[in-house]
Amino acid sequence: MKRNTICCIYNSGPHYRWPIFKALADNLDIDFCFGSNTVYTKSIKTFDYGKLPGFTRLLRNRRIFGKFYWQSGALRQLLKPYRQYLMLGEAYCLSSWIIAFAAKLLHRKTVCWTHGWYGRESGIKRIISKRFYSMFSEILTYNDYSGNLLAEGGIPRSKIHTIGNSLDSRKHRAMRSELRSTDIYSSHFGNTDPVLLYCGRVQQSKRLDLMIEAAHILQEHGTNVNLVFVGADNEHVGLEDMARRVGLQNKVWLFGPCYDDNKLAELFYNATVCVSPGNVGLTAVHALSFGCPVITHNNFPFQGPEFECVRPGLTGDFFRQNDAADLARVIAKWLGHTARQREETAKAAYAEIDGKWNVDSQISVFKSVLKQKN
């Protein structure tokens, strides 16, 4: 029986990342070790590790102090004859330091899969993380922005590669031919006003109050919009109360959590624009996958890496962070688009996702970096 030569060590396997891990298993000679949950949040559902070909070990993520943690069982992978290690690039994981250092002594390749730098890191954090990244043979960052920051900070450009990020891109691509305009919003609201959609966790940090305030500003200037919030409100943010205070209680739909891909596709496709007033992450990829433009803030050091798939005027736009009036101004630009313009936006959105933010392009990068062509 052929022995796999690559070991992937990761903190956990969130359910939405099943497509990329399954594609790795299908395309590379790779074993997987996952933690049962993340140190920072235990609320994220993981996929069934037992269904992933190559899954070999369940690790235990043990908090040491602050954000630092240790993955019990990870070091044992050094005793096996792996030639390459694909690892979550998180400097807070102390066991990863040991593995990266030991692998270097053993002349084994290490590949760091990481967010990299955001641009807001403090001096000491920068120094520590730079030392961490320097130990790896290759670095995979989610976007060009982070890779450029690492290169400017002294990490050799030759070892930095952009990997992008993805959801279930193959499935989403196949679903596009079935997308249709429906009455999902008009039947709920009883009107045909434009729809501003938010999809993600309903949290204080997402600044959804700005979305309601922007809608109020638009209304005062004679433009009515409907607001739809898709996601679980575990922090009791109080969106209904916010809407009631400005007289928009009949213009808000708290849809709640939704994990049905067909329903989400319908919601995105029929919305006028997806708005993420706080940082945006994979929501941007999700929205663009179904042709829906994305609006988010312009302070990139406080953004998720997926902000990079927002191309101003093409696939979405940016507004001044924390500025509801500017958010209203940017939203207004998109409300007047003709059917032809919306069609062009959808084409641009699909091109952006199909070019970089998908499983196939990620696998191409993995194969190149890990030097496997099978």
Locate predicted features.
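Short hydrophobic beta-strand element within catalytic cores of glycosyltransferases
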Residues: 293-302, 317
